[in-house]
Structure formats: C-alpha cells, structure tokens
UniProtKB/Swiss-Prot annotation:
The gene is eppA. Its main location: membrane. It is found in: Cell membrane. It is a multi-pass membrane protein. It comes from Methanococcus maripaludis (strain DSM 14266 / JCM 13030 / NBRC 101832 / S2 / LL). This is Prepilin peptidase EppA.
C-alpha cells in the first residue's frame, strides 16, 4: 500500500509529464491534446476523492466556474487543464476553489505577462537602462537632500515627475537623448557623493539604493513602454490570419460605409473600448484584445479586403503559448507543497 507522500509524489510527477507534453504541442501547434486532459481527469478525480473526499468534486466544479469567469484571454484547453488539476489540490480551498489552483492561475498569468517584457527590454535596453540610471541619480540626490535637511512631503511629487519623465521620453526624442546622456555620468555622481559625504554614503547604503532604484525604474519603464506602443507585433496578410490572432489595429466601419484602420497602442485600444461601451463611437469597431479573431471576424476582414475598403495586411500582436507558463507555475506549486523550496530557502 502506497503512503500519502509516495502516492501524491507519483501523481505530481504524472501530471508534470502530461503538462510537459501539452507544452510541446502548445509550442508546436498551439493545441492541448484531448488525451492529456482525459488522463488528468482519470487520475486526479479518483486520487483527489480518495484523499479529500467530496471537497475534490466541489473544487472541480468551482474551478471550472472560476476559469469560465476569468476566461477572457484563456483558451478552452487552459480552462480544462486547470479544472482537471483542481481535485489534486483540494486540501485547502477559498470559496471552494483550491488555494493552490488560484495561485497556479495567478502565477501562470504573471509569467505570461512578464515574458513579453523581456522582448521589450531586448529591443529598448539602450534607452531604458541609461534613462533609469539618470532618474535613479535624480532620486538619490533629492532623497539625500530631503533627509539631510529634514524636508518632507516630496516623494509624491518626485515619483510623479519620474513617471511623467518616462512618458515624455517616449514622445519627445530629444528629451530621451538628453536623459540617456545624463545616465552615463552616474559613476561621477556616485564617486562625488562618496567624496563629499562618505559617512552618509555608507550608513544609508547609497550605492545599493542606486541599483535598487535602477531595477524599479526599469520595470516601470517596461510597463510604460508597453502601454505606449512598444508591444511586439508584425504585419500579416489578411489571408494568412487565423482564429485567435490578436490584431493591434482598430478597424472601424462607419455608418456611411467608410472603413478606417488605425494602428493603436494598448492605451488607445482601451480608450476606444471604453468609448464603445459608452456609445460614443460612430459605426462598428473590430477589436480583438483578449479573445482574438473569431471566424466571423475573419470573414468580415476578407470581405472588406475584397471590396477594396482595407489593405491586404494588418498589424498582429506577437503572442506566446500559455501552457509553458503553466508548467513553470506548476513546478513552483508542487515544490512548495513538497517543502523543497522552504528547505532550500531555510
């Protein structure tokens, strides 16, 4: 007779292999095979019921409902996978949804959001790092002055300027060039600071704080760059578009039959969506953030192209398979449950 630890370890490993298989097919073909979900259900439901009783069943249905509610941007295969895993994690639940499944969904979404940021950093690091160094230097100077001379209520104004500065650098090239050049003098700032006030430099960890600020400002810059149009996209022929593709363009069909195509960043698309919900837009708009293109959308675009109302290609956002991020998050959850991470950290 298997003990709890051996049996649960075996099931964890079995599910890992299934998710690994789904990761391969998701990368290659953007599908999750049915046999993966079926095998998960065949194993996880009985094992979950054996250990956790009826809680495993309620967790199954509660997770299904949660995934359907959060389903914008989540494919049907992802919903099935999270649901099929849920009976295995029914030991602790929040409103009948396993706590570990909630963390698994959250971590998967977080990893999926962070990964595209690495692409933006790869493309724009020559702007982001120097300007972040300049802003970190500015923060260090102002913070030290306010602390030495006991000046209060400056943080809100300072960080407001920092965020505004990053936005301005995206819109005004000359300002961005100046910010970048100022970033290269930060070594002089650090050396000069140490020579002027070595006691404060050491006691307040100015050097460490400087690099922490650079990290924080780089992350803020990545988010602002993404919001202001640095999303990774490519042009694609309308005839090559597939169901699920997310177009960056806003296609608007006006009441007089005129069609406009606007290459819009995420802020413009969000604003357009809000205006649409408020009924402030003229005509009908096609936006695919979240769920992607449907068969009806593809038919409409091909019709508009055949009628000569739009060009032959649109800007399509680069998206990534979701299951690889689920695999990483699953490894984190299982290692935590097995105490491996706590052992390594502790």
């Amino acid at each position: 007779m298997f003990g709890f630890d051996n049996l649960i370890l075996g099931v964890y490993l079995f599910n890992f292999l299934l998710i690994l298989t789904a990761t391969y097919t998701d990368i290659k073909e953007r599908i999750i095979p049915h046999f993966v979900i079926i095998l998960m259900l065949i194993v996880n439901l009985p094992i979950g019921y054996y250990f956790f009783g009826f809680d495993a069943i309620t967790s199954f249905f509660a997770t299904l409902i949660l995934c359907l509610i959060l389903g914008v941007g989540m494919g049907g295969g992802d919903v099935k996978m999270f649901t099929a895993l849920s009976p295995l994690f029914a030991a602790e639940t929040i409103y009948f949804v396993p706590k570990d499944i909630s963390i698994l969904i959250g971590l998967s979404a977080l990893f999926a959001a962070i990964f595209p940021m690495t692409k933006i950093l790869k493309n724009y690091w020559k702007d982001i790092i120097p300007s972040s160094a300049y802003l970190a230097m500015l923060i260090g100077i102002i913070v030290s002055i306010t602390e030495i001379y006991s000046i209060g209520n400056t943080k809100t104004i300072l960080w407001s300027y920092i965020i505004l500065s990053i936005f301005i650098s995206r819109k005004i090239p000359k300002y961005r060039i100046i910010s970048n050049k100022l970033g290269y003098i930060t070594p002089i700032y650090l050396i000069g600071f140490y020579l002027l006030n070595p006691a404060y430099f050491v006691s307040e960890n100015v050097l460490i704080s400087f690099f922490v600020y650079i990290g924080q400002l780089s992350l803020i810059s990545l988010v602002i760059y993404a919001l202001t149009g640095a999303e990774i996209s490519s042009k694609k022929q309308i005839s090559d578009l597939k169901e699920g593709d997310i177009i960056r363009d806003i296609v608007t069909i006006k009441e007089n039959g005129e069609v406009t195509v606007e290459n819009a960043n995420i802020l413009k698309r969000f604003k357009h969506m809000i205006y649409g919900e408020m009924g402030k837009l003229e005509g009908k708009s096609l936006m695919t953030d979240g769920e992607g293109l449907s068969d009806e959308n593809l038919e409409l675009l091909n019709k508009l192209q055949n009628e000569g109302k739009i060009g032959g290609e649109l800007n399509v956002l680069t998206t990534y398979p979701f299951v690889p991020f689920v695999l990483v998050a699953y490894c984190v959850i299982t290692l935590l449950n097995m105490g491996v991470i706590n052992y390594l950290v502790g």
